[in-house]
Each structure stands twice: as C-alpha cells, then as structure tokens.
Amino acid sequence: MIQMQTNLDVADNSGARRVMCIKVLGGSKRKYASVGDIIVVSVKDAIPRGRVKKGDVMKAVVVRTAKDIRRADGSVIRFDGNAAVLVDNKKEPIGTRIFGPVPRELRARNHMKIISLAPEVL
C-alpha cells in the first residue's frame, strides 16, 4: 500500500537508489497503489553516473510492498520493504536489470518486460 510521500527502494540499474511517491495514477481521488500500479516518483538518491539524477520526476511501477497481497487461492505474499522499477512513458523499464523477486501479479497488469528481466517470480 503506497501513498503520497512513501519512500521506495529502486529495484533496477537505472541509477536511482531511493524514490518518493508524489502521485498515485488512476483516478483523481485515488489514495493508494499496490503491486503493478503506476505511480509518479521523485528521485531522492542516485548514483553518480546513472541514467537518472536526483530531483528527476519519473513514472514507476510498484513491484514489492510490505503490505500483504492476497491471492485467489487464499495465500498471502508480502515483502520486507517497498520497491519500484522506473519506467518511461511507454511503460518500458529504464534499466536493463531488475534486482530481487517480483510477484506473479505483474503478469496480469501486462508488465511482461519486468517479469522477463526479474531473476525470480513468486
């Protein structure tokens, strides 16, 4: 459950380390984002020679949340922290690698490129 002002780790090699959610996309009154949702983020911490700089405003896909995700079979999956992958306007990842596991729910949201780059799909 990601809302405005939430800090997230970046799970790709785009150059950003930490980002902060500044808007949840998908409706004027929408308050929360979950796995697979697109948010607008501000880069708060970045490595020196990365593709993005501190202060850049980007779009990102939420790939991990500390709030548990309920599945149709009754099982629950949750992660240790919140993480996102930076994407461009065509919803393609900016980085070329994804770090850490990602949930299967991204497939239903048509984020196939993120699924294919991820080392582990839970």
From Swiss-Prot:
Keywords: Ribonucleoprotein, Ribosomal protein, RNA-binding, rRNA-binding
GO MF annotation terms: large ribosomal subunit rRNA binding; structural constituent of ribosome
Task performed by this protein: Binds to 23S rRNA. Forms part of two intersubunit bridges in the 70S ribosome.
Record NCBIfam families: rplN_bact
Classification lineage: Bacteria, Pseudomonadati, Pseudomonadota, Alphaproteobacteria, Hyphomicrobiales
Subunit organization: Part of the 50S ribosomal subunit. Forms a cluster with proteins L3 and L19. In the 70S ribosome, L14 and L19 interact and together make contacts with the 16S rRNA in bridges B5 and B8.
UniProt source species: Bartonella henselae (strain ATCC 49882 / DSM 28221 / CCUG 30454 / Houston 1)
Name of this chain's protein: Large ribosomal subunit protein uL14
GO BP terms in the entry: translation
A GO cellular component entry from the record: cytosolic large ribosomal subunit
